[in-house]
Design a protein with these regions (language model features):
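Alpha-helical transmembrane segments and their helix-helix packing motifs
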Residues: 2-289
Length: 289
């Protein structure tokens, strides 16, 4: 007969947390579901996900504005924590985010989906996220948000976007890997939770880590860099007068730098980070053998 302590341990595991093997099975099942459902539904599910991540970057930008003299690390920590709201909204609302969808590699390696189904889902979700992010770009632009704090909010957008396009290609690739390692760790850990509170709280610090550290998220950049491009090239003279900066300083914010210098390497890094470093690694180690 088992002792009380052993029974209590088993009960605790059963009640409060899914086992690593169970999490691997959930990860596989989620990948199968995403890749085999009607992809028009995936596309429309991806649009709000892109919008949620964009709104999270709006929140982040607000926390980084007007912080002259504040601790750099603490300011970034606050920004990272508030940004986690975006990923929480994605999970709670059942939306599809490209970065977490890279973990469908698990379902592919298990043989339950084809390469075509996996890649089709990635492409559909990627462009759905892009539509959602750009929708928020235009809403924020027409709302005049760049003039908030006497133009300092828009200046934060400009400096953040410009910083992102000046990584080397390999730096952007590596930052993309690091980012999606943390995003997918956050998503994977939600498979262990059994309540909404479990799932929401477990994601906060991994997401805060990637944001505060400056790692690169392809979907977030679908908002931030286009927002910077529009601000740099279409702002009224009053904006530049308010921030007292020559607009030529941000002339390099353009489509070429966005796509070639950032979006492509970051996207590839996100695929490696989520699909290989987390999805395949954790599934291979923990799945029932």
């Amino acid at each position: 007969m088992k002792g009380n302590s052993e029974m209590n341990t088993e009960t605790s595991k059963t009640t409060y947390m899914v086992s690593p093997a169970g999490m691997s099975q959930i990860g596989e099942d989620v990948g199968v579901y995403k890749a085999t459902k009607k992809q028009i539904l995936s596309f429309f599910s991806a649009i709000p996900a892109g919008a949620f991540i964009a709104l999270a970057f709006v929140f982040y930008t607000t926390t980084q504005t007007g912080n002259v003299g504040a601790s750099w690390g603490l300011t970034k920590l606050v920004g990272g924590i508030v940004f986690s709201l975006g990923v929480i909204m994605v999970v709670v609302c059942g939306s599809e985010l490209f970065t977490s969808s890279t973990m469908t590699t698990v379902a592919r390696v298990s043989g339950r989906i084809s390469s075509f189904q996996m890649l089709r889902n990635w492409i559909v979700v990627y462009f759905g996220n892009f539509v959602g992010a750009l929708f928020i770009v235009f809403l924020i632009w027409f709302a005049g948000q760049t003039m908030a704090a006497n133009g300092q909010w828009g200046l934060t957008i400009l400096t953040t976007a410009q910083h992102k396009i000046h990584h080397t290609w390999f730096e952007a690739f590596c930052l993309g890997i690091l980012c999606n390692v943390m995003v997918c760790i956050a998503i994977w850990m939600t498979y262990a939770g059994k309540t909404l509170t479990d799932k929401a709280f477990i994601m906060i610090l991994p997401i805060a880590l990637f944001v505060a550290s400056g790692f690169e998220h392809s979907v977030a950049n679908m908002f931030m860099i286009p927002m910077g491009i529009i601000t740099a090239h279409f702002s009224a003279p009053e904006f530049w007068q308010a921030i007292n900066i020559d607009p030529q300083q941000f002339a390099d914010l353009d489509l070429y730098h966005f796509v070639v210098k950032n979006l492509i390497p970051v996207t590839l890094g996100n695929i490696v980070g989520g699909g290989c470093c987390i999805g395949l690694a954790l599934w291979s180690i923990n799945r029932p053998h």
